[in-house]
Amino acid sequence: MNPLRSIQHNITTPPISGGQPLDAVGPQAQQSHPKRISPSQLSQSAHQALERLSANAEHQRLASLVRNALQDGTFQFQSSNHTQVTYKASICLPADTDTVRTDHLINNELTVQARLNDQSEYDIVSAHLHGSSKAISFDVPSPPPAHGSASSVLSERTHLGMSRVLSQDAVDSSSPLLSSPDHSRPPSQHIGSVRRDSDSLVSDNPVVQALLSFAQADQQFPTQAASIAGVQLEMRPRRDIEKALEEFKGAFTVEKAQLMSGANSSERVDEDVNADIHIPLLLKAIERGAAAFGPNALIGQNSAKAFLASCAPKITSNDDVLSEFINRKLKGDDDLQVRLGAQELLHVATKKEFQLGGLAGSIGVSSILGSAWELGASELLKNAIFGKNFSPSQYALQLAGIDSVPPLMIESMDTMCVLAIIKGMKGEEWSMSDLLPKALKAGAISSVVSFPNNVLQYAGFKSKVGDLAANSMTTEAAIFGAASGIPPEVKESEELMRAGLFQSMKDGVMAHPGEGADTKKTIERMTRHALDIAPGESTAVKSMGLASIVGMIPLIASNKATGLLSEQVLRIFRSTVFNPIEAIALNALALGGRVNVPGLFDSDNAKHARVVQTILARASQHMEAGDRDISAEELHQMLAPRSEFLRHVGSAIVNGMNASFEAIPALVRKLGYGEAPLAERIPYQDLAVPDTSRQPAP
């Protein structure tokens, strides 16, 4: 059956066959054609032909491409003869969204043949889409000359350039948008099929469904929307989100904060903090929209609100009516655009990247030095000092002291690699001079803390249960000592972020928590929520929990417990796995964030998709921006669920270790020596009065 129905005209014209030449209309051969052709230059008959093709499921996509190219002005003049003119456009169908099975149609040429009628308007004769190996085309009969007085029916025909089978293969309207093997889908991209269900539109993708619910919350979709099968809807980044995130971070990095003087709490001194607060700012923007920012939240000459709105995802579809309707709804809702833009940036800001360099360095240092010590140097040194047939129990303390020396070097170098991994995950620059003091301190702690465990390797308790309990405690202590560079790093990030948030509120960058709110508790909660999802700190904390579990394997497999592995094998395990456990755990957790097991644990992408759903659902329920707020705890639960066992274990370990590290300095301060730490010098009480002296003039 002919897919195009006849079009009625007021004159009589014979049907045009496939091989019949088209007669020139007017001075066609001498006509100077424009370099580009636009919709305004088409005849009414051409528009009608495209509309009728758009209503046909088989050719809807090609007609849509022609209309889009006309509107964008991408059709360029190619050639002309005595009968028609040819225009061509390059169509780059997204390689990661195969709207027409683009495994064969990635690089496409779209050509249109047209002829100029007596009204100086162009009638479309045919259109062709040429891919790398296949082509799709349709022919439209030439409309009659404008003069004449009879009427007849034009015989319109359509043919598929290669074969009708191509229509089934290349334009399968029931297939979902496929992912190109050569291009990874952006993490914040959401694609779903759309179909009509009674008077509403529904989708198989939860995020797309939430978007449809918002768009039709107060009015129905046009009847033309999704009127055919195979309609797809896509949310994808509007701009270069990585670059936008760098702009956002740069604008809201707090370089100095006004803190209490160590000598006099009533005095304020400017202190370098270089605090990164972009994650808590983005969280607050998702929670409160534009109300999250104060009057001085600027990125260059633009407000933070306008900047985030420009980062909101764009909506595309192979149904122009559908995409136009939804985009119009989104553009009219500034608050929703701000929240969606903030979520786009947050998704990228919390993305965890695999750090191969740091992992290779850690394994290399630990394996080479550790194996050299465990499998050779240790025995040679001890034999040289105590003789070949010495009794280990007789020299337990001396032997333990010797075994405690290598960690000073090995763990110092390993901590350098671990801290470099954390900095890399955070996207921060680092230098050897910055990390070396921290690494040497961690190496010294590891050397001291490993001593009790080393003693028990040579002299244990008579009771097997007591010996196992003692070994378990000292092994965990040794694990914590080996990872002692992580807790101070997390604490430093926490203190700097608190100071940065305090100063941003004081400077009118971030909105004040509100009258009656406890500003200290608010800032502490914001900091905790941000660090729970920050790529560096959150992974570091979880790695402590993972290391505390995996690090017990050598003890469990030894002859002190199950005896599953020989001492020789355990030595190799300790050198290759136990020593670099923090670096291995950090990268394993980064990769684990990409794994999604429904009902068990969610990937990072799944968590952020749930946030987008919540934002859209709240907008659907409350069309007024002021009623859409998402509570801080609700958002935190979506991004850092309570079910994250390793986070809870790691947090307990990190907090406990930091408390033990702080015990002696706190005692010294009580005796009147030393300066209070940064966290204790933040004057939260100052937020009760706006600091107008530091705010720029309007």
UniProtKB/Swiss-Prot annotation:
Compositionally biased residues, Polar residues: 1-15
Leader sequence residues: none
Keyword line: Hypersensitive response elicitation, Secreted, Virulence
Localization per record: Secreted
Region (Disordered): 1-36, 171-200
Main location: secreted
Biased composition (Low complexity): 172-181
Transmembrane helix in keyword set: no
InterPro entries: Plant_immune_effector (IPR053430)
UniProt GO BP: symbiont-mediated perturbation of host programmed cell death
A GO CC term attached to the entry: extracellular region
Reported function: Effector protein involved in non-host recognition.
NCBIfam families assigned to the protein according to its UniProt record, in alphabetical order: XopB
Name of protein: Effector protein AvrPphDPgy
Organism: Pseudomonas savastanoi pv. glycinea
Lineage, highest ranks first: Bacteria, Pseudomonadati, Pseudomonadota, Gammaproteobacteria, Pseudomonadales
